[in-house]
A protein has these predicted regions:
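Active-site-adjacent beta-strand/loop module that shapes the phosphate/pyrophosphate-binding cleft
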Residues: 77-116, 130
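Hydrophobic (often cysteine-bearing) scaffold residues that line and stabilize catalytic clefts
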Residues: 11, 52, 145, 149
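Acidic, metal-coordinating catalytic segment for phosphate/diphosphate chemistry
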Residues: 1-22, 96
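Residues embedded in well-ordered beta-strands
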Residues: 16-18, 25-26, 105-107
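Generic C-terminal helix-cap and adjacent flexible tail
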Residues: 154-161
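NUDIX/MutT-family hydrolases
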Residues: 102-112, 116-148
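Conserved Nudix-box catalytic region and its N-terminal flanking loop in Nudix hydrolases
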Residues: 21, 25-68, 74
Length: 161
């Protein structure tokens, strides 16, 4: 059995998106690749040469199917937030290259209708979606993301009604 030296692994740079509807609820998707009842906000990697803000718009569109014109950027975390994944997941994710993710979070006001959302995208990440309150979302995510979500809501929560 190989023992992973987590201290030698880096964090994967990533963006996260808080999509907020007119009622102040947050878009959450149920992970398609997870057998548990794990929900999360959209997030994804930053491509080579891409700014975090550009990546956020692209990932939001890729994961929710909404057009850029249906989301208005209204805030961002001041810095980067990171989380570690459980050691047993490291070999399964990102070819075992990373210990977790280092994320810049962006808040978007959703300007569209629910019918504008289409999670049946080219490479779907979610099997279903829902609008959730902060508390509902915090109670339905994987435990290792709770702390980073709390930090996101500490910085951007004032944008959620």
């Amino acid at each position: 059995m190989n023992v992973i030296d987590v201290s030698k692994l880096k964090y994967r740079k990533n963006v996260g998106m808080v999509l907020i509807n007119a009622k102040g609820h947050i878009f959450a998707g149920k992970r398609i690749d997870n057998n548990t009842d794990a929900w999360q906000m959209p997030q994804g990697g930053i491509d080579e040469g891409e700014t975090p803000e550009t990546a956020a718009f692209r990932e939001l569109s890729e994961e929710t199917g909404i057009h850029f014109s249906r989301a208005r950027l209204i805030g961002a975390t001041a810095g980067w937030l990171s989380y570690d994944i459980p050691v047993e997941l490291i070999p399964q994710l990102w070819n075992g290259q990373f210990r977790g993710q280092k994320q810049k979070w962006f808040a978007f006001e959703f300007l569209g209708k629910d019918s504008d959302i289409n999670i049946a995208t080219e490479e779907p990440e979610f099997s279903e979606w829902a609008w959730k309150s902060k508390n509902d979302l915090l109670s339905s995510i994987v435990p290792f993301k709770v702390e980073v979500y709390q930090k996101v809501f500490l910085e951007l929560g004032h944008l959620v009604k």
